[in-house]
Amino acid sequence: MLLGVNIDHIATLREARKINEPDPLEAVFLAKRAGAFQITIHLREDRRHIHDYDVERIVESSFLPVNVECSTDKQIVDLLCELRPHRITLVPEKREEVTTEGGLDLLGRFEILKSRIAQFRENDIAVSLFVDPDITSIELSKELGADMVELHTGTFANLHLMLRSNLPKTPHAIPALEMDRRSLSLAYRESLLTLQKAAQKANTLGIEVAAGHGLNYQNVSEIVKIPEIIELNIGHSLIARSIFTGFEAAVREMVELLGRGD
């Protein structure tokens, strides 16, 4: 299974002081040396971490494929069509959110998504859609002409945290998931089954499958067992681990974990 390294939070650290370091571009070369498959960055409308010049420099300099996550915002879409990264992943976006909270509303935004996908295709850019892991979303992704879907693993990841970590004992416990362990265990197994079914459906329709959101060193072992998923995009847990082990070592460790699913 391939690893896409999301380096947004290197830029988050830079923006905390609003200076010029750490430089996300430096991480691109370290990720390659550690065995990563691609670089993933999110150019948000509010530019809270990655900026336009970051995208330009990374696309121009990276020896690895670059996957840029973005909304359907016209200014951003036009810019990315000029820069031409390897792939675009269209994601939903709310300015008030801490991180992406769910998959795209494919039905409600069908026409704008179709238009943006066509524009990227005209510029020879592959398109992935960040979707909730349900059959309807997969079928709509096929109808829209997506090359790939990235399955939102947030529910699975949150259940894993509440079931198998100390999160329930911290101020960041998830209120909606405060339930007994038996209920958590059942919901956890159901979330895995949902991901498996969505991946299988996409595979039968000829759509490549990636996954991401909330994945870490503790929970990826379950995801690598799903053979239809060929790529994971992981950021926060890698950057968090790198504080203690170094960035290159953190990436290499994750690459090794994903390799166990081959």
UniProtKB/Swiss-Prot annotation:
Disulfide bonds: none annotated. InterPro entries: Aldolase_TIM, PyrdxlP_synth_PdxJ, Pyridoxine-5'_phos_synth. Coiled coil: none annotated. Keywords: Cytoplasm, Pyridoxine biosynthesis, Transferase. Its main location: cytoplasm. Its EC number is 2.6.99.2. 3-amino-2-oxopropyl phosphate binds at residues 6, 17, 214, 235-236. One of its GO terms (cellular component) is cytosol. Pathway: Cofactor biosynthesis; pyridoxine 5'-phosphate biosynthesis; pyridoxine 5'-phosphate from D-erythrose 4-phosphate: step 5/5. Transmembrane segments: none annotated. SUPFAM superfamilies: Pyridoxine 5'-phosphate synthase. Belongs to the PNP synthase family. NCBIfam families: pdxJ (TIGR00559), PRK05265.1-3 (NF003625), PRK05265.1-5 (NF003627). Catalyzes the complicated ring closure reaction between the two acyclic compounds 1-deoxy-D-xylulose-5-phosphate (DXP) and 3-amino-2-oxopropyl phosphate (1-amino-acetone-3-phosphate or AAP) to form pyridoxine 5'-phosphate (PNP) and inorganic phosphate. This is Pyridoxine 5'-phosphate synthase.
